[in-house]
């Protein structure tokens, strides 16, 4: 283990180096660029034995990743924002083909207006693409997920591509303490990828085929079940990660002070840490504040959400996206999960951090204060121009 | 043990190395000793040479979760005198690269341009001002700063920048 002071992008590149992908295909886009630059340097310097493929677009990056995965090797790619949308056509191809590609997405605003800063509009718009979606809280978790994601995605019960989301700039470009594991540790945790779902001259199989009305549903059901199976695979993988690396993760969600919490912020990504700090502060004043961090948006942790919020009195879903004409994507999913669960909480939606707008300690404090009044509306933080 | 946190805002112009200084100080604190944590980040966005930029460093004895910009800094470091608003800071201490003594409460001047020009041959003052800051903060002594320089600067720049940092640190330490 080596102590380092690196950015989220750099930490993720270290994790990918340790996971030994045979192919890296990517196209640069802010704020993802650094992870790809670091990997290309590692390949050039001989630190990573991988085929780094410069492609001409994100659509090609994902097509190339699918082709490489179909050849039976471990693959990595990364993108952000418009790049993710440009490869959107290929995302369900990767998922439907059951190719366990790992992709880092640097969460960023979507145009127009043009904006290179962070929010979660890009990835949350692709929630139904068939990809596992994970949202990291800090650089250490990002690095650890670069490694753990392959174990989960490549598990034969899952065989599903895995998107690890890092908040653009707030996580990708922020330097912080990170422990970088040793290669031997990672090798003992993550075996080489092996699959029968590949182009094989000895055992030829039909791949990428058509399925008409009679059989289509069977493939889609199988894809759905594979994704759901990840919920059973995550806990033992995290247990083994703990044994080897000494860091404990909490499964599909992370609860903070939820045992007796009455006022709860449900959120995802790196703003979760700030919410936990604010809850800690409020506890000093006797306010029963808590935080539920959604780690996985897909598969969706409905059971965990139901049990975590059962005794809450007021809940705010805080997220950096909006599904125009409705509400935040996460808010809709949380509300849906709570229907019929016995939870009688009031629930509101606060959309914050759009286009990189800073979310401050006082912003979070104000949300908790507001929860005392049990609001149920959808509101924007920063919505009144000042 | 109660958490001790120090927050720093760096003011510079694109090309003056404000973010490099923010990273050096963060790395120095985080890697210099066990149980120390830091976070360093720029004011995000496109980089333009000469435009005013800010960078942030947070230092703590506990893990840091708050990634928001620093609004009440313990230290405001001005690499470029032209960016200093010539008034006492609303919070903390301002460390200003200037040969002028402003006579303001909470403002400390240090002629970093002169020192950088004489020792580095260029008026790039980020490492000088990091050394000045180091004299005010426990955990940022020259030994720790050298760890930060090793982590954040290419080998050809390390020795002379460390020398200028140590010089600034010791000149400030004498004055305190």
List the model feature ranges, each with a label.
Chain B
Residues 1-176:
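Active-site cofactor/cluster-binding pocket
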């Amino acid at each position: 283990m080596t102590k380092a002071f690196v950015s989220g992008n750099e930490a993720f590149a270290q994790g990918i180096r340790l996971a030994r992908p045979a192919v890296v295909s990517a196209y640069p886009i802010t704020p993802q660029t650094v992870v790809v630059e670091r990997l290309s340097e590692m390949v050039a310097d001989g630190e990573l034995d991988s085929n780094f493929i410069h492609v001409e677009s994100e659509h090609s990056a994902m097509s190339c990743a699918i082709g490489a995965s179909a050849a039976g090797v471990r693959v990595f790619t990364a993108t952000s924002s418009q790049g993710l949308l440009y490869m959107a056509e290929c995302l369900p191809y990767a998922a439907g083909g059951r190719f366990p590609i790992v992709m880092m997405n640097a969460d960023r605003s979507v145009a127009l207006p043009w904006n290179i800063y962070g929010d979660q509009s890009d990835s949350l718009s692709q929630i139904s693409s068939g990809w596992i979606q994970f949202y990291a809280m800090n650089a250490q978790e990002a690095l650890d997920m670069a490694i753990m994601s392959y174990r989960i995605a490549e598990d034969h019960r899952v065989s599903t591509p895995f998107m690890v989301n890092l908040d653009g700039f707030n996580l990708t470009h922020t330097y912080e303490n990170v422990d970088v594991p040793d290669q031997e540790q990672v090798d003992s945790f993550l075996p080489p990828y092996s699959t029968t779902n590949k182009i094989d001259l000895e055992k030829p199989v039909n791949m990428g085929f058509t399925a008409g009305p009679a059989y289509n549903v069977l493939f889609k059901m199988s894809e759905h079940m594979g994704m759901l199976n990840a919920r059973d695979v995550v806990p033992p993988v995290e247990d083994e990660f703990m044994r080897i690396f000494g860091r404990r993760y909490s499964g599909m969600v992370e609860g903070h002070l939820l045992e007796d919490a009455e006022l709860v912020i449900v959120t995802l990504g790196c703003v979760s840490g700030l919410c936990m700090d604010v809850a800690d502060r409020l506890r000093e004043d006797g306010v029963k504040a808590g935080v539920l961090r959604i780690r996985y948006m897909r598969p969706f942790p409905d059971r965990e959400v139901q049990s975590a919020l059962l005794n809450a009195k007021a809940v705010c879903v805080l997220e950096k996206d909006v599904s125009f004409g409705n509400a935040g994507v996460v808010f809709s999913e949380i509300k849906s999960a709570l229907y019929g669960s016995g939870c009688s909480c009031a629930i509101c939606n606060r959309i914050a951090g759009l286009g990189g707008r800073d979310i401050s300690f006082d912003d979070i404090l104000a949300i908790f204060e507001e929860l005392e009044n049990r609001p149920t509306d959808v509101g924007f933080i920063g919505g009144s121009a000042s | 043990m109660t958490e001790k946190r120090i927050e720093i805002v760096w003011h510079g112009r694109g090309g003056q190395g404000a973010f490099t200084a923010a990273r050096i100080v963060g790395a120095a604190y985080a890697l210099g000793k066990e149980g120390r944590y830091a976070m360093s980040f720029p004011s995000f966005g496109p980089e333009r040479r000469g435009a005013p930029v800010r960078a942030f460093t947070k230092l703590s004895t506990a893990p840091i979760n708050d990634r928001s910009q620093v609004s009440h800094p313990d230290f405001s470091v001005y690499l470029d005198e032209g960016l200093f608003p010539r008034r006492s800071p609303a919070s903390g201490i301002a460390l200003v690269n200037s040969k002028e003594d402003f006579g303001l409460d909470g403002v400390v001047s240090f002629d970093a341009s002169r020192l950088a020009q004489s020792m580095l041959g260029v008026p790039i003052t980020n490492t000088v001002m990091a050394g000045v800051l180091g004299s005010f903060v426990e955990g940022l002594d020259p030994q720790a700063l050298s760890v930060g320089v090793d982590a954040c600067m290419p080998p050809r720049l390390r020795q002379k920048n460390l020398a200028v940092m140590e010089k600034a640190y010791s000149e400030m330490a004498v004055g305190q």
